[in-house]
Amino acid sequence: MIAELFTNNALNLVIIFGSCAALILMSFWFRRGNRKRKGFLFHAVQFLIYTIIISAVGSIINYVIENYKLKFITPGVIDFICTSLIAVILTIKLFLLINQFEKQQIKKGRDITSARIMSRIIKITIIVVLVLLYGEHFGMSLSGLLTFGGIGGLAVGMAGKDILSNFFSGIMLYFDRPFSIGDWIRSPDRNIEGTVAEIGWRITKITTFDNRPLYVPNSLFSSISVENPGRMTNRRITTTIGLRYEDAAKVGVIVEAVREMLKNHPAIDQRQTLLVYFNQFADSSLNIMVYCFTKTTVWAEWLAAQQDVYLKIIDIVQSHGADFAFPSQTLYMDNITPPEQGR
C-alpha cells in the first residue's frame, strides 16, 4: 500500500522535497548575505514555493482519501485548509513587504505619521479584499458578504461605541494632522502635556516631561483644544525692566540702547515684532517693556539667547549709571517735636 502511494505520487513527492530543499538553500543564502536583500523577489519566490508545497501535500492527501475510502474527512475539507493556509501566508508576506516599505519611507525622511497611516490603510484593504475573494471562492455571494458585514458592523457599533469613536477619531488625527509623532503638545482644557510618542488606532501615547507614559483616548481630541508648540516658528522673549525713580532722566537713553542691542543681536529675528518702550509708572519703579522673538525654537537654545539678552540689558543699565528698582517705601516726617529731655 505504501509502495503504491509513493509510486502514484512520485511527482508530488519530488516537488515537495525539491521545494523544501529550495527553501533551505534560500534561507542559508540570505542568512549569509545582507538581510536587506530580502525584498519583493525573496518574498515572492518564498510564497510560490510554499504554495507549491501546500498544493502537492493537499494532492497527496486527497489521493489517499479517494483511494482508501476515508470517511472522517473529505477532499473539500482539505481544499479548504490548503486554500486557507495559502491565504494566510500571502497575507503575512504582503504585510512584511508593507512593513519594509514603511521603514524605507521613514529612512528617506518621510513623515512617520503619514507612512504609518498609509501602511495601515493598505493592510486593512488587503484583509477586506482577501476576505471577499475567499468567500466568493467557496460559493458565498459578494452581496451576501456585504450584507452580513453591514449587519455585523451595526451590531459591533452598538456594542462598542467608544471603541469605534476612538478608531474614527484616530483616522481623523491622521488626516487632519494637528500633531505628528515627536511633536510637543499640550491642552489648556486638560492636564495633558508632553511629546507624542505614538498615534494608534484607539489611543495616543504621550511621553510627559518627567518621562511618564500618558495614554489618551483618540476621541478626547475631538472635544478639547490642543496647542502644538512644536510647530511654532519662533520663541518669544518678554520681560519688564524696572528702573528707580531717581533714574528718570536716563530712561529714554536706556530704552534706545536696549532697542539697538536687540536689533543687532544675532539670535533675535528681525522679521518679527520687536518692542522696547517705557510703558508704566509703577509703585516703586519706572517700567520698560521688552518684547521680541528668537530665531530658534529649541528650548535650550532659546534659554541661552534669553540669558544673553538679559545680561546685556544689565550691562546697559549699569553703564548709564542707573540701577534696577526693588519694592520700597519712603517715609516723610514733618513738624516733629523732639521729646522733652527727662529731668
UniProtKB/Swiss-Prot annotation:
Record field: transmembrane: 10-30, 41-61, 78-98, 126-146, 148-168
Function: Mechanosensitive channel that protects cells against hypoosmotic stress when highly overexpressed.
Residue ranges that the UniProt entry lists as topological domain Periplasmic: 1-9, 62-77, 147
Gene: ynaI
GO biological processes: cellular response to osmotic stress
Family: Belongs to the MscS (TC 1.A.23) family.
GO terms of molecular function: identical protein binding; mechanosensitive monoatomic ion channel activity
Compartmental location: Cell inner membrane
Protein name, entry field: Low conductance mechanosensitive channel YnaI
Gene Ontology cellular-component terms listed: plasma membrane
Highest taxon in the source lineage: Bacteria
Oligomer status and interactors: Homoheptamer.
Keywords noted in UniProt: Cell inner membrane, Cell membrane, Ion channel, Ion transport, Membrane, Transmembrane, Transmembrane helix, Transport
Cross-referenced SUPFAM superfamilies: Mechanosensitive channel protein MscS (YggB), C-terminal domain, Mechanosensitive channel protein MscS (YggB), transmembrane region, Sm-like ribonucleoproteins
Database matches in InterPro entries: LSM_dom_sf, MS_channel_1st, MS_channel_C, MscS_beta-dom_sf, MscS_channel_2nd, MscS_channel_C_sf, MscS_channel_CS, MscS_channel_TM-2
Keyword field contains DNA damage: no
Residue ranges, Cytoplasmic side: 31-40, 99-125, 169-343
The keyword Membrane is annotated on this UniProt entry: yes
Membrane topology: Multi-pass membrane protein
